[in-house]
Regions:
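A short, flexible loop at the N-terminus of ABC-type nucleotide-binding domains that lies
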Residues: 1-4, 9-20, 52-57, 74-76
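ABC ATPase NBD Q-loop/coupling interface
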Residues: 64-79
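Conserved ABC ATPase "signature" region
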Residues: 116-134
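Conserved ABC ATPase signature
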Residues: 138-142, 146
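Conserved catalytic motifs of ABC-family nucleotide-binding domains
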Residues: 159
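Catalytic Walker B motif of ABC-type/P-loop ATPase nucleotide-binding domains
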Residues: 163-166
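H-loop/switch region of ABC-family ATPase nucleotide-binding domains
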Residues: 198-199
């Protein structure tokens, strides 16, 4: 469950100011944040995944954000990352490896998951998201849509209960958008909570 209570945030030099917002999202809900550029959609996603206040420098924050019982400003990022998976507008910004297989398992290895469990999560991810065509690939040889699909898979492998997607279709063509739509359908079927900041609504 996500609870945003009377939250205000103002960047030092950027748009995206929030003023006294309240938002409650129940487990399993899919919520789409829409609005003009600079209205604060991405800022809300950063409240949920902890980038605000843990990584965004400066700015003024007030109010309370609670994710699965954890007060975000008081919770270490690694604990938030166990619950909240983020897919960003530019997938290249979240890659840590050159080959696709290592990218899928990177988060699990970094979290100290035992090899047997890593193999199980890897196989479950490939099966659920139907990404066999991405395996054994060099990331630099992939299209933008394939990179986005791989980024989604690396998050899925971590098995978060909440997915946060920030403008995920911004750089995708029609086929890649349809692939993303199928992936979102899959996590909705599994009862995950989904928060999407988006300007395209037709694919949802």
């Amino acid at each position: 469950m996500i609870q945003i209570q009377d939250v205000s945030f103002e960047y030092e030099k950027e748009q995206g100011t929030l003023s006294h917002i309240d938002l409650n999202i129940q487990q399993g809900e899919c919520v789409v944040l829409i609005g003009e550029s600079g209205c604060g959609k991405t800022t809300v996603t950063k409240l949920i995944n902890g980038l605000i206040p843990h990584f965004v420098e400066g700015g003024t924050l007030s109010g309370t954000t609670i994710v699965n019982g954890m007060e975000v400003p008081k919770t270490e990022m690694y604990r938030l990352a166990e619950q909240v998976g983020s897919v960003f507008q530019n997938p290249k910004s979240q890659f840590f490896n050159i080959d696709s297989d290592s990218e899928i398992t990177f988060g699990l290895e970094n979290a100290g998951v035992e090899p047997k469990k890593i193999k199980e999560r890897y196989e479950a991810t490939v099966s659920a998201l139907k990404i066999q065509s991405l395996l054994g690939r060099n990331i630099f040889s992939m299209s933008g849509g394939e990179k986005q699909s791989l980024a989604f898979a690396s998050v899925y492998a971590m098995n978060p209960s909440i997915f946060v997607l920030d403008e995920p279709t911004a750089n995708l063509d029609a086929d890649a958008i349809d692939t993303l739509r199928q992936q979102i359908i899959q996590i909705k079927k599994e009862g995950r909570t989904v928060v999407i900041a988006e300007h395209r609504l037709y694919f949802l």
